[in-house]
UniProtKB/Swiss-Prot annotation, chain B:
One of its GO terms (biological process) is response to jasmonic acid. Keywords: Nucleus, Ubl conjugation pathway. One of its GO terms (cellular component) is nucleus. The gene is ASK12. Pathway: Protein modification; protein ubiquitination. The keyword Chaperone does not apply. This is SKP1-like protein 12. Involved in ubiquitination and subsequent proteasomal degradation of target proteins. Together with CUL1, RBX1 and a F-box protein, it forms a SCF E3 ubiquitin ligase complex. The functional specificity of this complex depends on the type of F-box protein. In the SCF complex, it serves as an adapter that links the F-box protein to CUL1. Plays a role during early flowers reproductive development. It comes from the Eukaryota. InterPro entries: SKP1, SKP1-like, SKP1-like_dim_sf, SKP1/BTB/POZ_sf, Skp1_comp_dimer, Skp1_comp_POZ. Residues 94-152 are annotated as: Interaction with the F-box domain of F-box proteins.
Length: 448, 152
């Protein structure tokens, strides 16, 4: 006896909702009573990798792709009758494929995630985009095209989470404006042809979390995010700009970067806008850019956690000013100690001998320091010693070795030596110093 | 501390005494308790005793507290054994869970049936559930063509 077909529609629909789209579509052929059942399902999870793999070459067959595209079109067209709560679409498309129009006009869609390895072309057709209920939008692609940001965002009046990675600004003056946005993740590549934007403004008064990675803009005229709690900022400096960043007033430098880089001091406006923040992560490039506004750096009164990432090609010029301006810092995370030595990383590190060293550190109330990517070089060990002597309130220092790149530990005996020194530091300082090494690493570095 | 008991009556006239805290995992029963109409027992016209026994077994297991401290992992293993049932019983359970509005049991039973569908061709699905194919060959061909991508 066929018990399953006699179950109420809602129940059968619930059973189907546990299946991926392909299997749901299959049931349409079981019998007449199953023909239209799939249309009742409020959650749709479409992943074309199921039917494209393992048979390669399937995707290229036009009829298959067309029928898949039609299916998606039809699913989205059903919205008026049976609203879709959640829709996830993962598929491999050619450049010519555009997203179905219905995706941009839906009265009920709440969450949308789009991922395309090559390019996502947001349709801005005649009717424009209207997704009045959309709360979360995630777009991941090598290139996202959507027109002007202001118009784009105005289509989502209640949007709370937005992720765009990676994208290019259409105009050189752009504004991110949304009263409802709480989480924003922008991974950008400047304007067309990898050019620095002229100005980027943020009018996002409800924003709590920001992940902003992009070429440095020449100006940040408006930064309205007073409620921001946490930010990760990566202001990318192009290779042909770094010299000018370090010597902004050097007239002898012959480069094209001049005019643009001289504006980078406006980054201070971005810093001013986020000065109420509690958790801040800055990359090596960002630190270089901040060196242009050390004197005007705002005070981060609420900052408890600061993370900085270092690279050997980038300097710590901004670190003393940063530390001085965080009067309530508790936790400092340093990913990579080695950095480009200048005479401006001043008293933060021990690289250049100076008399007044350590002052920005001495007044810093940080209680816990975490050092990641430790390579076991003498320079790093000296820096660690310098921190231990200078941070007056330090209670705990955790050191984690570099797991992937080259380290000094490959030299025979180096690991044991470093471990001994760190143990010594632990004994002679008031602070708890520990060096955490995975078993496999220890074995790798001690069997020489 | 003595716990409050309520009486559930199956469609075939059998009575089952159950702790109130266990029974109100069913939203339907929970509402009746709120509306205070449980004094003479709760008649469940749509659930026969054979199924009600299983429902009560499920609810007891899922009533996690100090007396019954069970981990999610163990619950998952228990679910597997619990759902080792004849097809007809599974469908009865689905209907009971739906009627009694016990979300986790409803999801579990539906997931079990979904797992029976997944990975099978339409012919295999029909065979598993005894579904009669009432399409004409032309009609079936048309349906397959419409969702061609799913059938390849």
């Amino acid at each position: 006896m066929d018990r399953v077909s006699n179950l109420p529609d809602g129940v059968r629909g619930h059973i189907l909702s546990f299946l991926p789209a392909k299997h749901i579509a299959l049931t349409s052929v079981l019998s007449k009573s199953w023909l239209n059942l799939w249309k009742l399902i409020p959650i749709l999870d479409i992943d074309d990798s199921e039917f494209l793999h393992p048979e390669e070459g399937k995707a290229e067959r036009l009829e298959i792709r067309q029928s898949f595209v039609d299916f998606v079109d039809r699913v989205l067209a059903l919205q008026d009758d049976s609203p879709i709560d959640r829709f996830s679409l993962k598929c491999i498309t050619e450049d010519e494929d555009m997203l179905p129009q219905e995706m941009f006009v839906s009265k009920t869609l709440v969450k949308l995630k789009i991922r395309n390895d090559r390019c996502v072309d947001w349709w801005c057709g005649k009717g424009g985009t209207s997704l009045p209920m959309l709360k979360s939008l995630y777009i991941d692609s090598d290139l996202i095209l959507w027109g002007k940001m202001k118009r784009f965002l105005s289509s989502f009046p209640v949007l709370e989470e937005l992720r765009m990675a990676s994208m290019e600004w259409k105009e050189s003056h752009e504004t991110v404006s949304s009263a409802s946005l709480r989480k924003l993740s922008i991974l950008g590549t400047g304007c067309e042809d990898y050019v620095n934007p002229k100005s980027i403004s943020f009018d996002t008064p409800s924003l709590l979390y920001l992940n902003y990675s992009d070429l440095v803009a020449e100006d940040y005229p408006l930064v309205n995010m007073g409620k921001l709690l946490e930010a990760r900022i990566n202001l990318i400096v192009k290779d042909d700009q770094i010299k000018r960043v370090r010597e902004p007033n050097n007239d002898l430098l012959q480069d094209d970067a001049g005019n643009v880089v001289l504006q980078f001091g406006n980054v201070v406006k971005l810093m001013n806008g986020i000065q109420n923040i509690q958790i801040l992560y800055l990359t090596a490039d960002t630190l270089e850019v901040l060196s242009l506004c050390c004197e005007s750096m705002p005070v981060f009164n609420n900052l408890k956690t600061l993370g900085i990432k270092s690279e050997e090609g980038r300097g710590w010029q901004a670190v003393p000013a940063l530390l001085r301006n965080c009067p309530h810092l508790e936790y400092l995370i340093i990913e990579g100690l080695l950095h480009n030595v200048t005479d401006k990383c001043g008293d933060a590190c021990d690289c250049i001998s100076r008399e007044d060293k350590g002052r920005s550190l001495a007044s810093c109330p940080v209680k816990k320091v975490e050092i990641q990517g430790f390579r076991g070089t003498m320079r790093e060990i000296n820096m660690i010693g310098h921190f231990l002597r200078s941070f007056k309130c330090l209670k705990e220092m955790g050191i984690f070795p570099e797991e992937e790149g080259p380290t000094n530990f490959e030299n025979p005996g180096a690991f044991e030596y470093v471990e001994k020194i760190l143990k010594l530091y632990n004994e002679i300082s008031n602070c708890d110093v520990y060096f955490l090494v995975w078993g496999y690493m220890r074995r790798k570095w001690t069997t020489q | 501390m003595s716990s409050k008991m309520i009486v559930l009556m199956s469609s075939d006239g059998q009575s089952f005494e159950v702790e109130e805290a266990v029974a109100i995992q069913s939203q339907t029963i929970a509402h009746m308790v709120e509306d205070d109409c449980v004094a003479d027992g709760i008649p469940l016209a749509n659930v026969e005793s054979k199924i009600l026994v299983k429902v009560i077994e499920y609810c007891k297991k899922y009533h996690v507290d100090e007396a019954n401290p069970i981990s999610e992992e163990d619950l998952n293993k228990w679910d597997e054994k619990f759902m080792d049932l004849e097809q007809s019983t599974i469908f009865e359970l689905i209907l009971a869970a739906n009627y009694l509005n016990i979300k986790s049991l409803f999801d579990l039973t539906c997931q079990t049936v979904a797992d029976m569908i997944k990975g099978k061709t339409p012919e295999e699905i029909r065979s598993t559930f005894n579904i009669e194919n009432d399409f004409t060959p032309e009609e079936e061909e048309a349906v397959r063509k419409e969702n061609q991508w799913a059938f390849e």
